[in-house]
A protein has these predicted regions:
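Thiamine diphosphate
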Residues: 1-156
Length: 156
C-alpha cells in the first residue's frame, strides 16, 4: 500500500508544485524517487515530529499542500498539540500519512503500535480520516485535494 501511495504522490508532485513531502526520517526505499527528483519539496527533518507538523502548518498557511509522513504513532502522538490546535481548530490544510496500522511495527515495541489511531483522531472533528484497503485514484485524489486537514493510515 505504501508503494502505491508513493507512486501516486510522485505523479501528483510532477504536476502540482504546491505539494511538499515532509518526513521524519522514514520512507527510505519507498520515497527515494521523490527525494531524488523533487529535492526542494522533499524534506527529511529527522526524528522531530513536532517540527515536521509545524513546518507543514506554515506551508499550508502559505497556500501549499504539505504532506507529513512517518510511522503512525510518531506522526500522531508526539505532535498531537499542534495537530489539535492548528489542524483541527485553525483548519490548516495539512495532510498526515501514517505508515503502519495496528501491529505492523509491533516487533519494535509498544511505542510503535498503532491500533488506536482512528479512535484518537476521531475526537478531532475537523480532520477528515481515511483508512483504505487500497490506494485507488479516487482515494488518493480526495485525500490530497479536499480542502480539509486530513489523515490517512497506510498498512505496511
Amino acid at each position: 500500500m505504501r508503494r502505491d501511495f508513493a507512486k501516486k504522490l510522485y505523479d501528483a508532485m510532477e504536476k502540482d508544485t504546491r505539494i511538499f513531502l515532509i518526513t521524519a526520517d522514514l520512507g527510505y526505499g519507498v520515497l527515494d524517487d521523490i527525494r531524488r527528483d523533487f529535492p526542494k519539496r522533499a524534506i527529511n527533518i529527522g526524528s522531530s515530529e513536532m517540527l515536521m507538523v509545524g513546518i507543514a502548518v506554515g506551508l499550508a498557511q502559505s497556500g501549499y499542500i504539505p504532506l507529513c509522513y512517518s510511522i503512525t504513532p510518531f506522526l500522531l502522538y508526539r505532535p498531537f498539540e499542534l495537530i489539535r490546535n492548528y489542524m483541527n481548530y485553525e483548519k490548516a490544510n495539512v495532510k498526515l500519512v501514517g505508515s503502519g496500522r495496528d501491529d505492523d511495527y509491533a516487533h519494535d515495541g509498544i511505542s510503535h503500535w498503532a491500533g488506536d489511531d482512528m479512535h484518537v483522531m476521531s475526537t478531532l472533528k475537523n480532520i477528515k480520516l481515511y483508512k483504505p484497503r487500497d490506494i485507488t485514484d479516487k482515494v488518493f485524489t480526495d485525500f490530497m485535494y479536499n480542502d480539509k486537514p486530513s489523515y490517512i493510515n497506510l498498512s505496511r
